[in-house]
A protein has these predicted regions:
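Conserved P-loop NTPase
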Residues: 1-5, 9, 190-225
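Edge strands and adjacent loops of beta-rich recognition modules
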Residues: 4-11, 15-20
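P-loop NTPase catalytic phosphate-binding loop
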Residues: 15-181, 185, 202, 223
Length: 225
């Protein structure tokens, strides 16, 4: 794995380009095998735990290069760079309406047994995002996170490790996600269960995250600083 992973190096890799073509999201390079670690939108929702908003913004940039439709719901003030490939909704009135529409669509699609992937919904900085949401919108959003993937809407939730202290319905569903990337040490969070935690966990070096799937964590090198 290169000492520093640059955008030019990462995006020029054949495996990364192939992942994007297949509708996958390349997350980074496995530190042991150097293979590209990817996320499949219809293979289980994804949680991103980080203390830094700059890393959330970098992850949003990574998502914007994908082929699939991506909708980002974000607090009014955020660090996301605008990109024509991605719809960013940061006006509370607009996202309340959008959440209601999507939850209804999921309902209709599931009744019609239409399970094809439509779009990936990204909740940017969740803890701040839901602060001003009405209870009805929170309930709809929790429904989207819980059932959306079957109805064609996969979810990525970006949030801080203090998610474990949140008791709202949206956070409760996000905490149950089986896949996660973490910019923090396993020891420094209690949201994601990890069974192969190292005895003496070192500080994470720059550009190193954990990718957790089915309670097993592997280190990956990422573009998020």
């Amino acid at each position: 794995v290169p000492e520093e992973l640059t955008e030019a190096d990462f995006y020029s890799r054949a495996s990364v380009q192939a992942a994007y073509k297949q509708g996958l999201v390349p997350l980074g390079l496995d530190m042991e095998t150097v293979e590209t670690v990817t996320w499949k939108p219809c293979g289980g929702n994804l949680l991103y735990l980080t203390e830094k908003e700059s890393q959330m913004a970098a992850f949003a940039r990574l998502l914007s290069r994908g082929k699939q439709k991506t909708i980002i719901l974000a607090p009014q003030y955020n660090e996301i760079e605008s990109d024509e490939n991605v719809l960013v909704v940061n006006n509370p009135d607009e996202y309340e309406e959008l959440i209601a529409v999507i939850s209804q669509k999921i309902d209709e699609r599931m009744k019609a047994k239409n399970f094809d992937h439509v779009a990936t919904l990204v909740l940017y900085n969740l803890t701040e995002l839901i602060e001003k949401m009405s209870q009805e919108t929170r309930d709809n959003l929790a429904y989207i996170l819980d059932k959306g993937e079957r109805g064609g809407y996969a979810s990525i939730v970006m949030t801080v490790p203090s998610l474990n202290r949140q008791i709202d319905p949206v956070s409760a569903v996000a905490k149950s996600f089986k896949k996660a990337i973490m910019a923090v040490r396993i020891t420094d969070q209690t949201v994601v269960a990890v069974n192969n935690k190292p005895l003496r966990e070192q500080l994470l070096e720059e550009q190193i995250h954990y990718y957790v799937q089915n309670t097993i964590a592997n280190k990956i090198k990422v573009l998020m600083y």
